[in-house]
């Protein structure tokens, strides 16, 4: 009986409100060197970005702008950009990527590229030379299975779930995956995406239905979603940016106007 009384007293003294407090940043936390525009993806927030659009929709142009234009990301990654692209040596739009990071460009996907990136980042963290990184996967979903149980492209799928741990907190880090068809992207990568960029060139009904099924509920339902898609389709080379890392989701048109 005495033990029961002690237990009851213990609960009587418990606080009325329980708060989940944020964990303090580690001592080696790096303060961001560049302040990003609030309407664009922020690599200092650890981004996994999906870029969806058909051929000649401006995917490569958009990515080149993010990687090179000072008003966007500029050169925040320095030499630490790895590119896997079937067309890197034949695409005029991507030539600046090839010139800047030619030693880290690969025409064919192989798990070893990801394994080597992981090893490199682990070593940089140990020696204090870590400055963050960017991994660009350009139209290579034929090398990565959309089936979460498949071993095809498994290294990069697994990497996409924990990539943020391979750099010191506060450094810029991003994975960019561009593809022509949304459903060809690994389910795991779709679920973990922090941002989705949809081209106005996406007109195929099945493709639009796939995107609506995935994201309409995040923006208040199908009516809102279709209104935003129509706004995006008013002009060529337009982009709808869904910031999935926020709750509720934020939606921007051409990184200029907030729609939701």
Regions from the PLM with identified roles:
Residues 79-80, 132, 236-239:
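Short, surface-exposed beta-edge/turn micro-motifs
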Residues 1-27:
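Charged, amphipathic alpha-helical linker segments immediately N-terminal to NTP-binding catalytic cores
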Residues 82, 174-176, 240:
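A structural signal for isolated positions on well-ordered beta-strands in alpha/beta enzyme cores
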């Amino acid at each position: 009986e005495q033990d029961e009384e002690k237990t009851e007293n213990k609960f009587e003294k418990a606080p009325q409100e329980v708060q989940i407090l944020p964990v303090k940043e580690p001592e080696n936390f790096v303060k961001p060197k560049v302040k990003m525009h609030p309407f664009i993806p922020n690599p200092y927030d650890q981004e996994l970005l999906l870029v969806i659009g058909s051929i000649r929709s401006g995917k490569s142009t958009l990515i080149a702008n993010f990687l090179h234009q000072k008003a966007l990301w500029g050169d925040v990654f320095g030499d630490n950009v790895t590119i896997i692209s079937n067309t890197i040596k034949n695409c005029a739009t991507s030539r600046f990527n090839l010139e800047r990071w030619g030693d880290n460009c690969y025409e064919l996907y192989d798990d070893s590229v990801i394994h080597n990136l992981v090893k490199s980042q682990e070593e940089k963290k140990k020696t204090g030379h870590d400055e963050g990184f960017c991994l660009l996967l350009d139209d290579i979903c034929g090398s990565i299975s959309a089936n979460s149980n498949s071993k095809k492209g498994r290294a990069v799928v697994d990497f996409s779930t924990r990539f943020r741990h391979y750099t010191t907190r506060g450094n810029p880090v991003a994975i960019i995956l561009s593809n022509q068809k949304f459903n060809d992207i690994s389910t795991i990568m779709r679920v973990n995406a922090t941002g989705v960029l949809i081209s106005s060139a996406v007109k195929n009904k099945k493709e639009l239905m796939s995107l609506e099924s995935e994201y309409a509920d995040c923006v208040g339902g199908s009516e809102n979603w279709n209104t935003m898609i129509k706004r995006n389709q008013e002009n060529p080379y337009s982009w709808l940016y869904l910031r999935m890392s926020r709750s509720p989701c934020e939606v921007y048109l051409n990184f200029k106007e907030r729609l939701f």
